Amino acid sequence: MFWTIFMALTDLVVPQAVVPSLRVNSKKQALQELAARAAAICGRNEREVLEVLMQRERLGSTGVGSGIAIPHGKLARLERLSGVFARLERPIDFEALDGQPVDLVFLLLAPEGAGADHLKALARIARLLRDPEIAQKLRESRDAEALYAVLAGHSTKAS
């Protein structure tokens, strides 16, 4: 499938899905804002997207550490993997594994049947965003174009 050939973060995120300075005060508010953006981009119901994300969060936080969260979920009738990236104005508590507040969030939605592709995408996103050099560039970028350029500049060949 898609991930067996090549993966760049820009294969998941269109320029309109990059939020350079999201002002939120809580994990719930962040998920609501990102769900709204993802729903608009995917042509889905905002409530449906938020519910999928909240169901996943109830299983355990998607705050992976180092100031990064990767909320994700699967949706029926979604055509392809799709994402939204946001740099938060101020770090928030995301109940991350390392207890650190989160300021970089990559929301990933996958088709219900994505299976291994969904897991591979999550692993690659985590690996790329936890790279200190990439994370620093993302934190220093102040507009959507600059953030998208950082995301576009980092890809990985499938293994």
Predicted regions and their residues:
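Cytosolic covalent-transfer regions centered on His/Cys nucleophiles
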Residues: M1-S159
